[in-house]
């Protein structure tokens, strides 16, 4: 008896094949997203290492210009630019907005950019979580459907023997294995990027704190006068 995957595919009906194609699409999508986010993370690391150049500059304009080539993912530069714009903003003295303290304006600008950066970092992770959660059940559906049709075929043949049962059932279990192969990388990728994003956001929050201190007090926390 030929128990190869090719034989199983040749014997599979439309439902099994459709299930396999769905799992394949889920796998391709999750791997594409994992590689894309990995590439983006590597570029963000490059930007974070360039923060020393930012603080070594003599002015905010020079600092932003020095950081821009390294910040290809636009995570740190928009934060600094928005804070600078908020600090330099001139308001009509008669307006209600003019009563807001400049420190609060800078804080609001920084918070808005941090929220945007968080949304950017977390983009796509819902897909990874969904693939990791549903792929095993999609594979299990294919297995149940395959076993059902295998048992129907065995009943139609009128003979019950271990070799007649083990072959079709074993082939049907391939769908469960396929579902796990799809789910495991998605779950690992989701967990890894969740941890990485937490560290990046903490670093971004620290950068925002330093920016706020510089623009309101004229110095970074810890700098000697």
Where are these regions (language model features)?
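Residue-level signature of catalytic and energy-coupling elements of molecular machines
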Residues: 13, 31, 63, 80, ...
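Transmembrane alpha-helix/interfacial motif
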Residues: 12-65, 69
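Membrane-interface helix-boundary signature
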Residues: 6-19, 121-128
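Predominantly long cytosolic amphipathic alpha-helical stalk/bundle segments
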Residues: 46-138, 147-161, 188-225
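Short, strongly hydrophobic alpha-helical membrane anchors
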Residues: 1-14, 155, 159-161
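Alpha-helical transmembrane segments of integral membrane proteins
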Residues: 17-33, 129-136, 182-187
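Hydrophobic alpha-helical transmembrane segments of polytopic membrane proteins
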Residues: 172-188
């Amino acid at each position: 008896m030929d128990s190869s995957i090719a034989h199983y595919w040749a014997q599979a009906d439309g439902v099994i094949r459709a299930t396999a194609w769905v799992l394949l699409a889920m796998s391709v999508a999750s791997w594409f997203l994992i590689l894309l986010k990995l590439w983006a993370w590597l570029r963000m690391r490059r930007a974070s290492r360039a923060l020393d150049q930012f603080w070594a500059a003599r002015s905010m304009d020079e600092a932003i210009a020095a950081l821009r080539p390294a910040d290809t993912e636009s995570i740190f530069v928009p934060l600094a630019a928005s804070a600078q714009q908020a600090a330099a903003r001139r308001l009509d003295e008669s307006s209600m907005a003019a009563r807001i303290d400049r420190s609060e304006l800078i804080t609001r600008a920084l918070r808005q950019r941090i929220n945007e950066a968080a949304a950017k970092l977390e983009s796509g992770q819902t897909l990874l979580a969904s693939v990791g959660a549903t792929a095993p059940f999609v594979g299990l559906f294919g297995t149940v459907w395959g076993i059902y049709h295998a048992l129907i075929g065995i009943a139609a043949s009128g003979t019950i023997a271990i070799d007649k049962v083990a072959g079709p059932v074993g082939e049907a279990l391939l769908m469960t294995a396929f579902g796990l192969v799809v789910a495991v990388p998605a779950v690992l990728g989701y967990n890894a990027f969740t941890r990485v994003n937490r560290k990046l956001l903490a670093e971004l929050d620290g950068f925002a704190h330093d920016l706020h201190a510089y623009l309101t007090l004229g110095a970074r926390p810890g700098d000697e006068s």
